[in-house]
Amino acid sequence: MNPAQPTLEQFEALDALVGEWTTFPDVAESTGMIVTRVHSMAEDGTLVAFRDPRDGVRRIPAEFLMDGHPIDALRGTMTVLRDNLYTDLEAVTWLFTEDESLPGRPIDFLRAGRKAEIRRRAQTLDW
């Protein structure tokens, strides 16, 4: 949804946080969707993807998927972060960064179905 793509340095820093990535064809295969539907999900904010500057392939953090489907809380949480003027790069960095006050990473809370606390925090962020 956010057209700005990370530089090599930014992507490598994000890669260190995210760890495991998946691609559009892999998501399509695991969900039984056609790949154009996965592209639509990235366009409408259901998923977030970044172009890897090393090979030009668009990648999605694997933890954005559970049981082969996008986690339900991701789209709304990304909307809150974007409304607070976070870029997708900043938002995903925040989601994958340890927060001792939680404790843990915001993405772990979203995956556990605990979106209210994460969205509350996202609304009050001062990046």
Predicted regions and their residues:
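Non-transmembrane "mature" sequence context
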Residues: 1-127
